[in-house]
A protein has these predicted regions:
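Iron-associated oxidoreductase/ferritin-like identity signal
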Residues: 1-121
Length: 121
């Protein structure tokens, strides 16, 4: 099962990088300065990063699910705040939100499959 999940998690990571690029570009358009120092990301992030401590695929999936759910809440907040006020940022937030919901669904599906496999063993 790990061989099926790893490419999907890599795809998620690529999409997260794309999200960061979209947000950095928008910050620049608004004449702000994106955070480029990873240490600052940890300080300012609404969702905290937790480095994996267990290599078991179930643990990794659960940890990723927590992160995706936090991201969903944050992008929903941004979409709500910018609705009717900043159409460009609102559009970016809702596009990212859709991706995050898709990631959440992928992770839930994998966790469900993993649970079914365990029950059959």
């Amino acid at each position: 099962m790990r061989s099926e999940i790893e490419p999907e998690l890599l795809k998620h990571a690529e999409e997260e990088l794309y999200h960061a690029e979209l947000l950095a570009e928008r910050i620049l358009q608004l004449e702000g300065t994106p955070l480029i120092d990873p240490q600052e990301w940890f300080t300012h992030a609404g969702c905290k990063y937790a480095a994996p401590t267990d290599i078991y695929i179930g643990s990794i999936l659960n940890q990723n699910l927590i992160g995706e759910r936090c991201a969903i809440n944050r992008y929903q907040e941004i979409a709500n705040i910018t609705s009717g006020i900043d159409h460009t940022t609102h559009k970016i937030a809702t596009e990212i939100l859709e991706d995050e919901i898709e990631h959440e669904n992928d992770l839930v599906d994998y966790l469900t499959d993993l649970k079914l496999i365990k029950e059959k063993i």
